[in-house]
């Protein structure tokens, strides 16, 4: 397992990390806490994974408690990432929540500090290695108090690196662009980026290169929600609680057709491993967070760090296929975020952040 660094922070992480949303939310099948802890320990002990990405909203703190159980006696050997911003403490909102709908978000300094203290308690630690604001939207990007709070938490030693996680849809282009313009000392951005879903991630990378010299990226949904694992067919039926069950059938059919164009990537590695190597070819990618939900996947994806890099010809062919949408004609992607540059008039009409 190779490692990369968040520049200027002292934080070094494995090229392949482990995102705990597959273990703690039930959206990828149910896992007991004992099963989750066993997988986390195997990731570290057997495969050299050192970066573990949680969020307070994953299972209402469950992912953080799983980390504390798995690594409580060896805290200094692993790197914890977590995310804040959803008000998981609002009982009324929790009871009214339906399915995977979003909880209310809060980014005022007092709430952020409260959320961090609760994360520290659940993680059973006195510092967080990487803290990101979870699914920030444009009003939060434009709230300087939120980012000053992140810097203050860093000075106080409660966090070592800070940034933002964009989603849950793959949009949010100008949220990220404006963030690196406004806060050029930001350490990291978490975003969706993969061979099949290159936009808007590529544009986010270009913005960081232009404005934020030390901003690196931790990548989630590395396999296009499983499509790049190369295991699905047009007849696949996802389990009842699997979030992909609720996607339109065209997502599955078109995805399978796109994947069939990528056989040339599997001459020296599995498609899943080659998909991670495609990401790792970008120097600003500090770590990848594939969705891991069984031991076989864990072994396959962790081995991707040592898999042969893609050749220049393979990289060129992927780029050419992407320009042609992998030979598939489909409706344009719809996004939840800001995919056009807001004008000054738009900004004036936008909701303003709450007072601290």
Task: Enumerate the predicted regions with their spans.
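Active-site groove signature of glycoside hydrolases
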Residues: 120-139
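Beta/alpha (TIM)-barrel catalytic core signal, keyed to glycine-rich beta->alpha loops juxtaposed to Asp/Glu
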Residues: 3, 135-329, 339-356
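Conserved, mostly hydrophobic/aromatic
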Residues: 6, 18, 36, 52, ...
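Short, acidic/polar
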Residues: 30-43, 105-123, 170-179, 275
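N-terminal small/glycine-rich loop or linker at the start of catalytic domains
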Residues: 9-28, 81-103, 130
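N-terminal binding-site loop/beta-alpha segment at the start of enzyme catalytic domains
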Residues: 1-79
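Acidic (Asp/Glu)-rich catalytic clusters
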Residues: 8-10, 69-76, 120-124, 151-155, ...
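Alpha-helix N-cap and loop-to-helix initiation/capping positions
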Residues: 28-35, 62, 66, 100-111, ...
């Amino acid at each position: 397992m190779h490692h990369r660094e968040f520049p200027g922070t002292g934080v070094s992480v494995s090229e392949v990390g482990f995102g705990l949303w597959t273990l703690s939310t039930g959206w990828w099948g149910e896992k007991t806490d004992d099963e989750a802890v066993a997988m986390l320990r195997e990731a570290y002990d057997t495969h050299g994974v050192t970066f573990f990405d949680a969020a307070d909203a994953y299972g209402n703190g469950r992912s953080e408690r799983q980390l504390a159980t798995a690594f409580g006696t060896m805290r200094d050997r692993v790197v914890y990432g977590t995310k804040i911003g959803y008000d998981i403490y609002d009982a009324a909102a929790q009871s009214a929540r339906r399915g995977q709908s979003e909880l209310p978000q809060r980014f005022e300094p007092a709430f952020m500090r409260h959320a961090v203290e609760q994360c520290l308690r659940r993680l059973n630690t006195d510092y967080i290695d990487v803290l990101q604001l979870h699914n920030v939207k444009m009003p939060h990007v434009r709230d300087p108090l939120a980012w000053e709070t992140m810097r203050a938490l860093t000075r106080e030693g409660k966090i070592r690196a800070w940034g933002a996680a964009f989603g849950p849809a793959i949009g949010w282009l100008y949220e990220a662009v404006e963030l690196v313009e406004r806060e050029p000392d930001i350490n990291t951005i978490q975003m969706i980026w993969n061979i099949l879903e290159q936009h808007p991630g590529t544009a986010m990378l270009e913005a960081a290169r232009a404005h934020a010299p030390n901003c690196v990226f931790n990548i989630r949904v590395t396999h296009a929600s499983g499509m790049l694992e190369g295991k699905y067919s047009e007849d696949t039926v996802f389990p009842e609680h699997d979030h992909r069950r609720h996607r339109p059938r065209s997502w599955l059919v078109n995805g399978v057709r796109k994947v069939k164009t990528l056989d040339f990537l599997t001459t020296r590695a599995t498609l899943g491993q080659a998909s991670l190597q495609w990401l790792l070819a970008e120097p600003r990618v500090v770590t990848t967070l594939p969705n891991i939900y069984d031991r076989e996947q864990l072994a396959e994806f962790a081995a991707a760090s040592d898999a042969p890099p893609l050749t220049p010809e393979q990289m060129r062919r992927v780029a050419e296929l992407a320009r042609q949408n992998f030979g598939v004609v489909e409706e344009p992607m719809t996004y939840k975020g800001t995919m056009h540059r807001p004008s000054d008039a738009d900004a004036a009409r936008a909701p303003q952040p709450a007072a601290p």
